C-alpha cells in the first residue's frame, strides 16, 4: 500500500516519556515493555503515532538527551529485542513510531568524544567543535542554553569544545562528511 505524501497531516500523536509512563518490572522506572503493555489502551484512544522521548544508552545527565550509544537501548528501558517488539506491535496496530533522535550533540561519554578530546591529531579529533583559547579565555562570549559559557576547556587538547546545552553534551561537527555519514547511518538503522 502506497503511503500518502502528506501522511503527517493526519497524525494523532501521543507522546510517551518512557521513564515515567509504565513500569513493567517494579523497579520504579518506566520501560519499553511497560509501553508495550499499554498499546491496546493507546490504540483505543485513536492514536496513529507514538512519539518517544530518548531511549538510547545515556549517562542521563539530561534525561536521555545526552546519548552515549546510538545503537543501544538504555538498560533501564529494556533491550533491542524489546524495542523491536514495540515497533512490530505498533505497526500491527497502524501506529507509527516517532523518536527523539538527538543528532546535534552526543554525551561527553560517547566513544567519539572520549577519543576526540585526547589530542588534536587523532582520527576523531575534528568530530566535535573545538576552538583555541582567545587571550587565555573562551573563544567568544556565546552562552549555553542551560546558562554559563557554551565553551568548556579540555587541558589534554589545550582547547575549548562547544556545547549549546549542558557541558556534558558536546556539539558534533556536522559540517564534516565523516560525521554526517555515521550519523545518517544511525538514523537509517532504525
Task: Name these PLM-found stretches.
Residues 177-181, 185-190:
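Single conserved hydrophobic/aromatic residue that forms the stacking wall/gate
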Residues 2-175:
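Acidic/aromatic-lined carbohydrate-recognition and catalytic surfaces
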Amino acid at each position: 500500500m502506497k503511503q500518502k505524501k502528506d501522511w503527517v497531516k493526519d497524525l494523532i500523536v501521543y507522546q510517551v516519556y518512557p521513564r515515567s509512563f509504565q513500569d513493567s518490572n517494579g523497579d520504579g522506572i518506566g520501560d519499553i515493555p511497560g509501553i508495550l503493555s499499554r498499546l491496546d489502551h493507546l490504540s483505543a484512544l485513536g492514536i496513529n503515532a507514538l512519539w518517544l522521548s530518548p531511549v538510547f544508552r545515556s549517562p542521563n545527565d539530561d534525561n536521555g538527551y545526552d546519548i552515549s550509544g546510538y545503537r543501544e537501548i538504555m538498560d533501564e528501558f529494556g533491550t533491542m529485542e524489546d524495542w523491536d517488539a514495540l515497533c512490530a506491535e505498533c505497526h500491527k496496530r497502524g501506529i507509527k513510531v516517532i523518536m527523539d533522535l538527538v543528532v546535534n550533540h552526543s554525551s561527553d561519554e560517547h566513544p567519539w568524544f572520549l577519543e576526540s578530546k585526547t589530542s588534536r591529531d587523532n582520527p576523531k579529533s575534528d568530530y566535535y567543535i573545538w576552538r583555541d583559547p582567545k587571550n587565555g579565555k573562551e573563544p567568544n562570549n556565546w552562552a549555553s542554553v542551560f546558562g554559563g559559557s557554551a565553551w568548556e576547556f579540555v587541558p589534554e587538547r589545550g582547547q575549548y569544545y562547544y556545547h549549546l546545552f549542558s557541558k556534558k553534551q558536546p556539539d558534533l561537527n556536522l559540517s564534516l562528511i565523516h560525521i554526517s555519514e555515521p550519523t545518517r547511518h544511525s538514523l537509517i538503522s532504525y
